[in-house]
């Protein structure tokens, strides 16, 4: 087996599998205009029945996925507000739904969880590359890198604070600009 193929069949990390599961749930909920929790409950049942539509999750990954869904529902308005301020030159209607939903998921984690930013961004870029268009990974990376930088600046943290984890490989597209740190803050973001 070639090195590339060996790498392809390795299991996906628990948190990344949970993120991909939630991304699929979020995408399906948006397309069907169905409540996120209802889609999550259905997806969990489908997964438990052995259907491969959704990735199989162990108990820890499923718990993490449920936390993400709950947080996304609770903070959806604030997340969308931050994304509107961060993404310049694009409206949500102009964006691919895959890119928008990856951004929503990662923005929730960046703002409301203690997760280090680089692994969250890296997972988001991987999901965008897997499910999105040719430029999705680069676009998502650019938006999230700017958002991460702004969030760290808001709490007075040095941009070098996240250097313990590898930085994403792509750079921001020309039409993406970081949010204005002086703009109003979303409700209850995490303290870093």
Swiss-Prot record:
SUPFAM superfamilies, sorted: NusB-like (SSF48013)
Alphabetized GO MF terms: RNA binding
GO biological process terms on file: DNA-templated transcription termination; transcription antitermination
Keyword presence, RNA-binding: yes
UniProt keyword list: RNA-binding, Transcription, Transcription antitermination, Transcription regulation
A Pfam entry, by short name: NusB
Chain intervals with Low complexity compositional bias: 159-184
Region of interest: Disordered: 154-192
GO CC, alphabetical: cytosol
Highest taxon listed in the record's lineage: Bacteria
HAMAP family assigned: NusB
Entry's family note: Belongs to the NusB family.
Task of the protein: Involved in transcription antitermination. Required for transcription of ribosomal RNA (rRNA) genes. Binds specifically to the boxA antiterminator sequence of the ribosomal RNA (rrn) operons.
Protein name, as recorded: Transcription antitermination protein NusB
Organism of derivation: Deinococcus radiodurans (strain ATCC 13939 / DSM 20539 / JCM 16871 / CCUG 27074 / LMG 4051 / NBRC 15346 / NCIMB 9279 / VKM B-1422 / R1)
Gene this protein is translated from: nusB
């Amino acid at each position: 087996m070639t090195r590339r193929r060996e790498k392809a069949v390795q299991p996906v990390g628990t948190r990344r599998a949970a993120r991909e599961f939630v991304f699929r749930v979020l995408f399906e909920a948006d397309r069907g205009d169905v409540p996120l929790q209802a889609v999550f409950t259905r997806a969990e049942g489908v997964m438990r029945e052995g259907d491969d539509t959704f990735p199989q999750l162990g108990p820890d990954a499923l718990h993490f996925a449920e936390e993400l869904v709950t947080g996304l529902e609770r903070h959806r308005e604030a997340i969308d507000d931050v994304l509107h301020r961060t993404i310049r030159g694009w409206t949500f209607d102009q964006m691919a739904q895959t890119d928008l939903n990856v951004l929503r998921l990662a923005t929730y984690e960046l703002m409301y969880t203690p997760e280090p930013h680089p692994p969250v961004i890296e997972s988001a870029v991987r999901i965008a590359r897997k499910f999105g268009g040719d430029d999705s990974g680069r676009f998502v990376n650019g938006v999230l890198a700017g958002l991460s930088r702004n969030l760290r600046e808001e709490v007075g943290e040095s941009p070098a604070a996240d250097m313990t984890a590898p930085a994403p490989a792509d750079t921001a597209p020309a039409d993406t600009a970081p949010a204005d740190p002086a703009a109003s803050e979303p409700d209850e973001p995490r303290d870093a």
